[in-house]
Every structure is written in structure tokens, then in C-alpha cells.
């Protein structure tokens, strides 16, 4: 898993961060770190720090970054609308999400902090479909679409309607899209307990390589 993570993150960084042909206005990113879910106690340790540090690195590399912390459903909707509106034809569009994610009907949903999830239908009502978001980004003309999803955590919601966490689902993505999960499909990972998740730690390490 570590070798694969390093290889894929290296590919992502090399394909985007080091591409000189994209001006700042042609690189847009939405970075979300959700840690304070009322149904989760204590709050997650890693998502906000991961999001802040990644946002800073992306800004240094020429991205126009929108950073959200502990975002409600309304805040995520508005931020996604802003992201879609900032995309120019051929642009690089990057989405990073750290928090809880849930699989439903073979799609992965990113969960805002104010979600009210008691049954599986609530996931589709309150969550944000990754597949739908990537389709919208593609429809706005982005040339390179990147989704970095650190949401395969065991969460407090699924135990209400499942015997075990289902992890995240494979995504049917448009061409020119790179999707990277922090764990294998349908698998779950625990927080490291440190300042950064392993996923974010390796991503930041790749971005900070001198010369990129």
C-alpha cells in the first residue's frame, strides 16, 4: 500500500504541480477538512491540519485555493458552486476532502459536519456524491481533474444501519481524472493520532520535494 501510495502521489504531483503551462488562474482547488462531527467524540485530529497545510502548499504552487474547515452542508454547497464557477476551459481542478465518507448504492459520499444520518437514505440526502462532483467539474471544461479523498475512516453513522463499515466505492470518472483514496476500496483506516494522516503526510512530502 505504501509503495502504491507513493507512486500515485508522485504521479499526481508531477502531472500538476510541476506543469509550467498552467497559470495561477488556471489552477483551482477546493480543500476541505471536516473534524468536528457532533456524532463523533472526540473530534478527528487530522483533517483540519491536513487541509490547512495542503492549502498552503497548493497556494505556493500557484493554485487559487478555497479552504473550508468543519463545513456544513450549506457551506460545502456554496464552496462547490464557487469551485465550478472558477474553472476555465482546460484548467486544473483539484478537490481534497478529509473527514468522513460513506459508500451508498456503489457511490462514495463526502459527509458535512451537520449531516443527520440514521439510515442509508440519509447518506444520499445529506452527503455529496464524489461522482456527481467530478461530473460537474468535467462539465465546466477542466482539462485535468484531481480528487484526493481521505475519508475511509470508521465512522459513527454506519453502525446505525450496517453491521460493518463499507469503506468507499470505486468511482466512474471522466477522462483526464485522477482519483486517489487514502485506503483500498471498501477498506477503512484509523486516524494515526498525529498531526497528519499518512495520506496527507506523503502528499505533502511529495509536494515539498525541491525542484518541483
Protein language model annotation of sequence segments:
Residues 26-27, 63, 142-144, 174-177:
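Short glycine-/polar-rich loops that comprise or flank the Walker A/P-loop
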Residues 174-202:
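The feature captures the short pre-catalytic strand/loop hairpin that immediately precedes
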Residues 34, 151, 182-184:
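Fold-independent oxyanion-binding glycine-rich loops
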Residues 159-167:
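Short, surface-exposed loop/helix-turn segments at secondary-structure junctions
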Residues 27-29, 209-212:
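Caspase-like cysteine protease fold
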Residues 74-98, 102-160, 191-199, 204, ...:
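Caspase-like (clan CD) cysteine peptidase catalytic core
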Residues 55-59, 169-174:
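Short, conserved catalytic or adaptor-binding loops enriched in Gly and charged residues
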Residues 2-109, 114-119, 159:
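Boundary/activation segment at the start of structured domains
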Amino acid at each position: 500500500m505504501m509503495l502504491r501510495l507513493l507512486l500515485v502521489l508522485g504521479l499526481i504531483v508531477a502531472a500538476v504541480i510541476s506543469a509550467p503551462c498552467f497559470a495561477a488562474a488556471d489552477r483551482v482547488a477546493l480543500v476541505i477538512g471536516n473534524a468536528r462531527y457532533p456524532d463523533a467524540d472526540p473530534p478527528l485530529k487530522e483533517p483540519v491540519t491536513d487541509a490547512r497545510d495542503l492549502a498552503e502548499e497548493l497556494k505556493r504552487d500557484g493554485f487559487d485555493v478555497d479552504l473550508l474547515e468543519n463545513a456544513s452542508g450549506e457551506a460545502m454547497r456554496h464552496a462547490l458552486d464557487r469551485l465550478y464557477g472558477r474553472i476555465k476551459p482546460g484548467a486544473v481542478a483539484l478537490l481534497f476532502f478529509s473527514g468522513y465518507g460513506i459508500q451508498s448504492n456503489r457511490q462514495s459520499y463526502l459527509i458535512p459536519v451537520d449531516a443527520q444520518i440514521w439510515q442509508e437514505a440519509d447518506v444520499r440526502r445529506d452527503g455529496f456524491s464524489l461522482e456527481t462532483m467530478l461530473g460537474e467539474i468535467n462539465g465546466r471544461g477542466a482539462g485535468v481533474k484531481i480528487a484526493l479523498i481521505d475519508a475511509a475512516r470508521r465512522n459513527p453513522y454506519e453502525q446505525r444501519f450496517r453491521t460493518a463499515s463499507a469503506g468507499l466505492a470505486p468511482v466512474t470518472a471522466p477522462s483526464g481524472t485522477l482519483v486517489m483514496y487514502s485506503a483500498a476500496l471498501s477498506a477503512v483506516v484509523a486516524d494515526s493520532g498525529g498531526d497528519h494522516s499518512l495520506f496527507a503526510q506523503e502528499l505533502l512530502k511529495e509536494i515539498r520535494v525541491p525542484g518541483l
